[in-house]
């Protein structure tokens, strides 16, 4: 390491005028220190994913779909920024519930959960969900939409079934609707883990429905193997993160990766693992452009998204 190689670009002080006249991302680049640099660098990589990659993954966890970010996810899909979605079963629950009239409310982390249970209100962080606006909404939607589909054919892949549900949704903020409109596959490897999957199972007892998860695997396999450049925005951890990077090992790894997370790597968890660990598994290429942003997605994702529309 030589001083002249690393002491190249100085940190810049910012002023109130900068906050009024510059883009927030450019302000972060001037600040540079600590998390500001990772958000700026992540935004630059995200722009390259959208402009250069023919395969563009976004993976995220269901809790975010209970917030106002749901509409942002739908809009990014509708505008074609991403053409492959990997998520969890709860995403489908929240999207269906809210699409068919379910109301989610602003609350507090500090509310008494014992008292909320007495008045039939779920708490998801500081989001409040009346009992009747969640499980019942999903159950009614499945009971109404699924039987005619099973009469057409008994065996369905998950992504095709979700397109059919999206086709019957009129809410412009719906992720399922946006995916249907753009033929964007939504891959849900843990589809049975939630209200939607449970109701599919119940309906299968009466309708003969069969879910073919291997067809979803075939689709993601074909997309990965045929891609020339692949990038991913991975928000949160768990099965959606792992399924995304897992399949990309078969093309020698992602070319671009942006992790947005609050998980830490000290416990050896998949959720906390950084991109450098994925390199050892061949899931991200050694020369890939990558960034880790340690932040709550409700704070950082809207800022990152501005880089796509600026």
From Swiss-Prot:
One of its GO terms (cellular component) is cytoplasm. Pathway: Protein modification; eIF5A hypusination. The gene is dys. InterPro entries: Deoxyhypus_synthase_arc, Deoxyhypusine_synthase, Deoxyhypusine_synthase_sf, DHS-like_NAD/FAD-binding_dom. GO terms for molecular function: deoxyhypusine synthase activity. Keywords: Hypusine biosynthesis, NAD, Transferase. Coiled coil: none annotated. Belongs to the deoxyhypusine synthase family. The keyword Zinc does not apply. Catalyzes the NAD-dependent oxidative cleavage of spermidine and the subsequent transfer of the butylamine moiety of spermidine to the epsilon-amino group of a specific lysine residue of the eIF-5A precursor protein to form the intermediate deoxyhypusine residue. The lineage of its organism: Archaea, Thermoproteota, Thermoprotei, Sulfolobales, Sulfolobaceae. It is an enzyme of class 2 (transferase). PANTHER family: DEOXYHYPUSINE SYNTHASE. The active site is at 283 (nucleophile). Its cofactor is NAD(+). This is Probable deoxyhypusine synthase. Its EC number is 2.5.1.46. The keyword Transferase applies. It catalyses: [eIF5A protein]-L-lysine + spermidine = [eIF5A protein]-deoxyhypusine + propane-1,3-diamine.
């Amino acid at each position: 390491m030589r001083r002249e190689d690393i002491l190249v670009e100085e940190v810049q002080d910012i002023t109130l005028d900068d906050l009024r006249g510059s883009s927030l991302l450019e302000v972060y680049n001037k600040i540079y220190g600590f998390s500001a640099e990772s958000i700026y660098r992540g935004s630059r990589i995200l722009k390259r994913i959208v402009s250069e990659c023919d395969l563009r993954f976004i993976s995220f966890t269901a809790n975010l779909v209970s917030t106002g970010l749901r509409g942002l996810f739908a809009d990014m899909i509708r505008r074609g920024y991403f053409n492959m979605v990997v998520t969890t079963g709860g995403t489908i629950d929240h999207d269906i519930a809210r699409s068919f009239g379910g109301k989610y409310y602003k609350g507090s982390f500090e509310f008494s959960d014992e008292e909320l249970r007495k008045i039939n209100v779920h708490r998801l962080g500081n989001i409040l969900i009346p009992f009747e606006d969640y499980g019942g909404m999903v159950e009614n939607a499945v009971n109404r939409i699924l039987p005619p589909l099973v009469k057409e054919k008994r065996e369905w892949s998950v992504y095709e079934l979700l397109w059919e549900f999206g086709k019957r949704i009129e809410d412009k903020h719906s992720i399922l609707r946006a995916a249907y409109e753009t033929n964007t596959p939504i891959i849900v490897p843990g589809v049975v883990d939630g209200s939607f999957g449970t109701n599919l199972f119940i309906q299968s007892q009466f309708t003969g429905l069969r879910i073919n998860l291997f067809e979803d695997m075939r689709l993601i396999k074909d997309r990965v193997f045929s891609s020339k450049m692949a990038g991913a925005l991975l928000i949160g951890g768990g099965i959606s993160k792992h399924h995304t990077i897992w399949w990309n090992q078969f093309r020698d790894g992602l070319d671009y990766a942006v992790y947005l997370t609050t998980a830490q790597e000290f416990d050896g968890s998949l959720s906390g693992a950084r991109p450098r660990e994925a390199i050892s598994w061949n899931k991200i290429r050694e020369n890939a452009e990558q960034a880790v942003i340690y932040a709550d997605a409700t704070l950082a994702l809207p800022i990152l998204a501005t880089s796509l529309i600026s």
